[in-house]
């Protein structure tokens, strides 16, 4: 409950807090208690004003606020928000505390209080004080008018509702900020900074929708959610441990046995065996044992019960707290280690230490921890352990078992003790849980630097029978000696015979060894340690290192420092929750995000191209480079890509392009997932509201701001990203796919803060969905437990995979905070994820400090190979709206097992297809550049060369032409004639170089060179374009069509480089540039794809294989159990259906695992799974038929029910919804049964059930509407808040019921009725301030009646005394005789009886035990004459009072009646003010006495 506001009124603490917030710290307020004022006049004079709370009583902490104001000199003023007439009733009361002073009432008008008197005192009251302390104060009349007008002004335009909402919003804390002069200014300055929950009538068709997640956790068993209590965080328990240490455990022993102190690392330890560390470990075991018992119950195991039917799984947090306090003192009474002789004495002393602690801390322990002295005595008896009742109660078991679990460290042989203690704990919590306790025990020993013993089931030492410290014996025949069996027909042997260690063995007898004992059948059945071995010490440490550790300073700190020791245990305890989870999965040592795969690289490239060219965006698709990308493509990107990885591939140019994109999408509408919210124009809002100027860094901050703060945007984006959206437009899906990676990039670029290890995420979920999450979490937690001998990792793997908890936070930028109060208080979330990231796997990014107060805000995009696994669920009280709040503690774990196996190519395929137009365009240009060779020119040149060679006189030139030029021309001609580009390519290198030509300077030689260069360019152009570029382009295109990235890149490498093509003058510079740009663009697109890494799904092949074999091995037995399952009623049928569906999910998991293990190219063999699926399918028909029969019975029974009240109706509604869900489940089962058949599905049987349920629905709508109307008319002031919340819930439930109706006419009619009920609730809310005002006026009436009664009866007492004395003086001596015979009457008896009667009336009227309504009810039972006589009012006034009391005795919410009653109170109080105390009754007595005397 809020501490500052009760209903809509400020409490005393709230009044002090609001004045402190306004700059008036430590004010003193006054009270009027039962009509008696408590006023500190000195404080009033110092402060200048004093709020006074009236109507206070032992039964009521709040009341009506008024204000005393110190004026000039000895002048005081009274301000009453109810008005002048109400203030005058308090004037006389308060004047008694201001002797000699003048107290005036400010004449403000009535009817404006609206139940907000505390607020008015802190607002207009303070302003009145300021006015009255001016050098020239206003007249009271003017001040009254000013106050009246100010109150009227503030109440206009639903002012009362606004004030009420603000008061409720600040009910726990007033927002920080500048000092304000009064409450009005404070409200207006802080309204925008507080979360105001506006009243919303229930609109038809707006019932909450849940997220479509179907957990597979069985719904059969549950335990109450833990409230978060823990040894490590509870100060009460910690203080008890400190007290025990300071006064006992930290003191030297006074005895002699093993009492010598030990020096560990320079610190003395006085009690190394039964000291602080031992005590704290036993307390930690208690917590572990209860945790594991709860897990065992959730697993469906049967546990040993106590006399009251409870088990250790039913221990409450409050009970465990008391048990731990008792454990803190369990060994405090020891004088030394001689416990066997002094057990009774030591435990008596421990009990006395406990009792002494409780007595010294009684004020904080009783009744807050222990209910009473009887409760304390019970725990004292547990400590004393007088009768060794170790199984009587949870306290007995936990205290004694905790002690025993810790004893293993000092007992030999350890195998014997471990087996015995295991057998003692096992019945209470089961074998699996017992293993977990002893596994945790070893971790606790490590954590507190205690020695950890080994366990060897092959130990040849004699076995010790712990219970009695005896032995078992192997007889002469080599078999164990046993007791004779009592049952002659029993085939099994008797129990092992116990022998004292003092008994002398006979010849050929010997003690049974440890290994022999552990191999016995009866031991192996109950103890899983047979054939197992556990190493002692600490893994990784050599013996001498381990001994150093055991004698270190930290060992001493664990014995001497409560906080240090608890910290060590807490760390170990926490690790035992995480280790089983990690053990169940393939390990991953890499903490960083994985490298991008091909599709993520392709996605980034596509995002970049769209951002750079927003004109490619159309209303229902994107048309990019010839490819039409529709909604499914972008949904695939969101569902299959890690968008944080995609974001890491983007650059600042892409960020800058956001402004361009937003301009293009200026009028694109974005819709919040809230159906009532108006759509927002994306680009326009970005430009006008979000963007605040600045460069690329500011764009990043603005994008983050948009994602974090604008619900119209982030609710839709998150819903689309997680594929749980409805009615999204293509543009909204596209924007989500573009902005999600860009937001991640912005977060990565702007975050500079170190990554926190703990984050909190708040969600507001429907109760139904939250309960499913709780069920999922508890199923996972129950199956992830530490083990000592038995490997449970396969079951843990299965439950975590089947109940994936990560999807709630996956695929989107999830907002989190390092401060739990952000989701808890600021946002009022009913679900909080406490996310632990000890290994730094989540890479949270600080949102940025662009908004003040956002420094604690972080965003996480969950890596796809990281899962959030629950390790704890805690109840965390109520939200501001009265909902239960739960905290889910999750740990981040990384493994290839969490990486989904997507079919690749969903993004690469479209990207590669986009490259085809580029290739085709280059091919077109190259084709255009091709020319037919000029063969005639070659012929002519050949002839010319032949002539010059023949007639040349220079022998060198002649030789050059014949050997270098002529062959090249011949080869070129052949190549051109045959169109053989290969020959032409080779010929190119044979053309004479410029150096060779330079040796000949003749005119003929120079002309010949020019001609040869022209031929060379002709050959070169054909050889390069047709022999290299066109084939390379064709090869590249062919490779891209086959998604052969390497082949495409190799083809691109076959295109000459830019440097090579610079010398190819035969090809135009423009074409060369186009070719090189296309090559570069294609290479830049394809090379990153070639470097992409495919995530490795299997890092430990053997582990995955063994896990699969274990999973599939358990399925046949589960199927056999289903075949034999009992189907006697609906509950049992549903239980079996749930198990059936769960088994189907297990088979799906097995299919996924088989795919994960598959590495070859051949088809996966699913034959083993298919065989199991076929077996399962045979069971389904029988299940469906049984489900239909039992559901029909239940619906028929519901039709016949006749509810008597709203509770009955709501119970029927609950059954109605359950049956609606059953019908839907039945429909799904029918679809499953139909399978892949092409025949139409016959749903007639289900349709009949739906018709019957519709009749129930119609009846419930009418019944609920009627009952809601009645309850609304019966709302009362004291319970208004609770009744209002209940009414809102009922109206929501009615709305949901109406929406279930199938007839449109019926729906419309009932929605009209719902609207009327909504309006009626609004009217009651409006009437509430008047109801509060009526209560205050009723209190004033009672106070005035008390004053009248007091004055009247005081006057009557005087008159009676005088009259009684007169009668006594006037009696003669023997008148007693005439009285006795009846001739006269002694009227003193009558006077005395009347005095008693009136005194009883006065006592009841002033009884503090009654609340206001009880007082009114008692007075209403009196008749008018009794009221007249007892209070001293006129007959007419008594009749009016009786009538008024009769009305007030019945509460009302109707304004007309409230106003009528307020008017009657005012009229009566005015009449009372004019009447003087009456003494008619005394006069009547006098006359009667006189008459009797005359007789």
UniProtKB/Swiss-Prot annotation:
Subunit structure: Homodimer.
Positions that bind NAD(+): 761-767, 857
Species: Legionella pneumophila subsp. pneumophila (strain Philadelphia 1 / ATCC 33152 / DSM 7513)
Region Disordered, residue ranges: 476-497
Biased composition range(s): Acidic residues: 484-493
Name the UniProt record assigns to this protein: Ubiquitinating enzyme SidE
Gene: sidE
Residue ranges the record marks as coiled coil: none
Modification note: Glutamylated by SidJ; glutamylation inhibits sidE activity to catalyze the production of ADP-ribosylated ubiquitin.
Family indicated by similarity: Belongs to the SidE family.
């Amino acid at each position: 409950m809020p501490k500052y506001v009760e209903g809509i009124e400020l409490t005393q603490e709230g009044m002090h807090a609001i004045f402190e917030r306004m700059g008036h710290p430590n004010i003193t307020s006054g009270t009027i208690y039962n009509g008696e004022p408590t006023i500190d006049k000195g404080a009033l004079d110092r402060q200048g004003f004093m709020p006074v709370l009236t109507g206070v009583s032992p039964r009521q902490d709040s009341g009506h606020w008024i204000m005393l104001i110190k004026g000039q000199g000895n002048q005081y003023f009274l301000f009453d928000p109810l008005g002048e007439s109400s203030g005058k009733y308090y004037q006389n009361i308060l004047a008694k505390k201001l002797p000699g002073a003048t107290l005036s009432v400010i004449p403000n008008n009535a009817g404006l209080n609206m139940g907000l008197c505390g607020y008015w005192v802190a607002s207009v009251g303070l302003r009145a004080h300021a006015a009255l302390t001016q050098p020239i104060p206003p007249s009271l009349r003017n001040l009254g008018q000013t106050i009246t007008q100010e109150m009227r002004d503030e109440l206009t335009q639903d002012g009362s509702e606004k004030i009420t909402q603000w008061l409720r919003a600040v009910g726990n804390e007033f927002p920080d900020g500048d000092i304000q002069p009064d409450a009005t200014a404070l409200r207006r300055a802080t309204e925008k900074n507080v979360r105001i929950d506006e009243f919303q009538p229930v609109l038809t068709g707006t019932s909450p929708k849940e997220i479509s997640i179907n957990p597979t956790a069985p719904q059969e068993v549950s335990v109450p959610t833990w409230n978060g209590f823990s040894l490590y965080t509870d100060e009460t328990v910690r203080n008890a441990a400190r007290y025990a240490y300071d006064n006992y455990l930290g003191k030297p022993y006074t005895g002699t046995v093993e009492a010598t102190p030990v020096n560990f690392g320079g610190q003395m330890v006085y009690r190394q065996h039964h000291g602080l560390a031992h005590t704290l470990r036993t307390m930690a075991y208690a917590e572990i044992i209860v945790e594991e018992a709860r897990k065992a119950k959730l697993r469906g195991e049967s546990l040993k019960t106590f006399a009251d039917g409870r088990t250790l799984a039913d221990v409450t947090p409050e009970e465990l707290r008391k048990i731990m306090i008792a454990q803190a003192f369990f060994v405090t009474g020891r004088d030394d280690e001689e416990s066997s002789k002094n057990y009774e004495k030591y435990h008596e002393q421990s009990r006395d230490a406990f009792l002494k602690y409780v007595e010294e801390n009684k004020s904080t322990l009783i009744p807050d921890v222990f209910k009473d002295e009887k409760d304390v005595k019970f725990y004292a008896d547990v400590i004393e352990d007088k009768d060794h009742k170790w199984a009587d109660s949870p306290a007995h078991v936990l205290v004694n078992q905790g002690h025993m679990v810790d004893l293993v460290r000092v007992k030999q042989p350890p195998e014997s003790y471990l087996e015995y203690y295991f057998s003692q704990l096992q019945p209470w919590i089961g074998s699996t849980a017992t293993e977990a306790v002893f596994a945790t025990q070893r971790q606790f020993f490590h954590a507190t630097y205690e020695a950890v013993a080994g366990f060897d089931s092959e130990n040849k030492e004699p076995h010790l029978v712990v219970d009695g410290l005896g032995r078992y014996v192997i007889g002469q025949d080599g078999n164990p000696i046993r007791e004779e069996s009592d049952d002659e027909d029993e085939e099994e042997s008797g129990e092992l015979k116990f022998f004292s260690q003092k008994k002398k063995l006979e010849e050929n007898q010997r003690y049974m060894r440890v290994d022999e004992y552990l191999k016995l059948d009866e031991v192996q059945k109950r103890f899983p340690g047979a054939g197992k071995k556990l190493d002692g010490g600490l893994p990784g440490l050599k013996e001498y290192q381990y001994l150093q550790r055991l004698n270190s300073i930290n060992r001493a700190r664990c014995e001497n420092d409560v906080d240090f020791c608890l910290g060590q245990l807490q760390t170990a305890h926490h690790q035992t929750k995480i280790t089983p989870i990690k053990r169940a999965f393939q390990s991953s040592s890499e903490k960083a995000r994985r490298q991008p795969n091909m599709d993520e690289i392709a996605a980034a490239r596509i995002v970049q191209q769209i951002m750079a060219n927003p004109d490619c965006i159309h209303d229902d698709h994107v048309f990019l480079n010839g490819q039409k990308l529709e909604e499914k493509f972008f949904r695939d990107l969101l569902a299959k890509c890690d968008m944080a990885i995609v974001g890491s591939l983007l650059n600042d140019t892409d960020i800058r392009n956001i402004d361009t994109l937003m301009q293009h999408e200026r009028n694109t509408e974005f819709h919040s997932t809230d159906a009532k919210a108006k759509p927002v124009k994306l680009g326009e809002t970005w430009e006008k509201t979000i963007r605040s100027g600045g460069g690329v860094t500011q764009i990043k901050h603005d994008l983050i701001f948009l994602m974090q703060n604008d619900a119209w945007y982030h609710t839709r984006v998150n819903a689309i990203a997680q594929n749980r959206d409805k009615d999204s437009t293509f543009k909204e899906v596209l924007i989500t796919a573009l902005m999600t990676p860009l937001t991640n990039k912005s977060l990565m670029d702007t975050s500079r803060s170190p990554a926190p290890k703990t984050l909190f995420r708040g969600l507001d979920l429907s109760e139904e969905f939250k309960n499913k999450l709780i069920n999922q979490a508890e199923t996972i937690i129950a199956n992830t437990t530490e083990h000592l001998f038995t490997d449970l990792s396969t079951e843990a793997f299965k439950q975590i995979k089947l109940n994936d908890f990560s999807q709630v936070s996956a695929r989107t930028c999830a907002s989190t905070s390092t401060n739990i109060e952000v989701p808890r208080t600021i946002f009022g979330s009913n679900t909080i994820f406490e996310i632990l990231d000890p290994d730094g796997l989540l890479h949270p990014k600080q949102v940025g400090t662009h908004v003040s107060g956002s420094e604690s805000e972080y965003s996480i995009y969950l890596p796809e190979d990281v899962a959030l696994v629950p390790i704890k669920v805690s109840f965390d009280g109520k939200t501001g709206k009265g909902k239960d709040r739960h905290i889910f503690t999750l740990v981040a774990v990384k493994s290839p097992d969490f990486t989904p196996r997507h079919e690749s190519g969903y993004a690469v395929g479209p990207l590669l297809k986009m490259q085809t137009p580029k290739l085709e365009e280059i091919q077109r240009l190259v084709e255009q550049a091709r020319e037919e060779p000029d063969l005639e020119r070659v012929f002519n040149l050949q002839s010319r060369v032949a002539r010059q060679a023949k007639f040349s006189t220079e022998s060198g030139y002649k030789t050059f032409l014949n050997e270098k030029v002529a062959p090249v021309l011949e080869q070129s001609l052949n190549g051109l004639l045959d169109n053989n580009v290969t020959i032409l390519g080779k010929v190119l290198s044979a053309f004479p170089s410029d150096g060779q030509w330079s040796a000949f300077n003749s005119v003929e030689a120079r002309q010949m060179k020019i001609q040869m260069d022209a031929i060379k360019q002709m050959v070169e152009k054909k050889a390069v374009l047709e022999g290299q570029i066109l084939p390379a382009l064709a090869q590249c295109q062919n490779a891209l069509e086959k998604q052969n990235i390497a082949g495409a890149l190799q083809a691109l490498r076959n295109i000459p480089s830019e440097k090579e093509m610079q010398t190819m003058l035969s090809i135009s510079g423009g074409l060369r540039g186009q070719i090189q740009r296309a090559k570069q663009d294609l290479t830049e697109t394809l090379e990153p794809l070639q470097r992409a890494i495919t995530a490795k799904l299997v890092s430990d092949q053997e582990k995955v294989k063994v896990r699969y074999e274990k999973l599939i091995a358990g399925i046949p037995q589960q199927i056999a159990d289903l075949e034999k399952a009992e189907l006697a009623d609906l509950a049992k049928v549903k239980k079996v259906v749930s198990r059936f569906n769960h088994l189907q999910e297990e088979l799906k998991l097995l299919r996924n695992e088989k795919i994960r293990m598959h590495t070859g190219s051949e088809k996966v063999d699913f034959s083993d799974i298919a065989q199991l699926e076929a077996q399962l399918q045979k069971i389904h028909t029988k299940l469906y038929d049984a489900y239909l029969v039992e559901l029909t019975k239940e619906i028929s029974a519901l039709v016949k029910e006749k509810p008597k009240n709203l509770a009955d109706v709501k119970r029927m509604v609950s059954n109605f919804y359950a049956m609606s869900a059953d019908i839907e489940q039945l429909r799904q089962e029918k679809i499953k049964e139909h399978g892949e058949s092409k025949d139409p599905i016959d749903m007639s049987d289900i349709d009949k059930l739906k018709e019957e349920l519709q009749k129930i629905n119609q009846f419930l709508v009418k019944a609920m509407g009627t009952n809601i109307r009645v309850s609304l008319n019966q709302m009362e002031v004291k319970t208004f808040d609770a009744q209002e919340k209940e009414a809102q819930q009922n109206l929501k439930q009615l709305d949901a019921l109406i929406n279930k109706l199938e007839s449109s006419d019926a729906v419309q009619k009932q929605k009209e009725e719902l609207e009327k009920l909504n309006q009626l609730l609004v009217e009651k809310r409006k009437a509430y301030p008047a109801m509060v005002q009526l209560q205050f006026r009723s209190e004033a009436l009672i106070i005035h009646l008390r004053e009248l009664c007091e004055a009247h009866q005081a006057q009557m007492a005087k008159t009676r005394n005088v009259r009684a004395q007169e009668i006594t003086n006037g009696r003669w001596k023997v008148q007693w005789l005439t009285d006795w015979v009846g001739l006269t009457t002694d009227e003193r008896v009558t006077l005395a009886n009347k005095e008693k009667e009136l005194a009883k009336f006065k006592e009841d009227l002033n009884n503090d035990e009654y609340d206001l309504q009880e007082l009114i009810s008692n007075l209403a039972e009196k008749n008018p004459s009794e009221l007249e006589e007892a209070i001293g009012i006129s007959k007419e006034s008594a009749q009016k009072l009786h009538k008024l009391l009769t009305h007030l005795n019945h509460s009302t919410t109707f304004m007309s009646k409230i106003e009528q009653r307020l008017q009657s109170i005012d009229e009566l109080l005015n009449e009372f003010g004019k009447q003087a105390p009456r003494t008619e009754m005394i006069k009547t007595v006098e006359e009667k006495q006189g008459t009797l005397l005359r007789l």
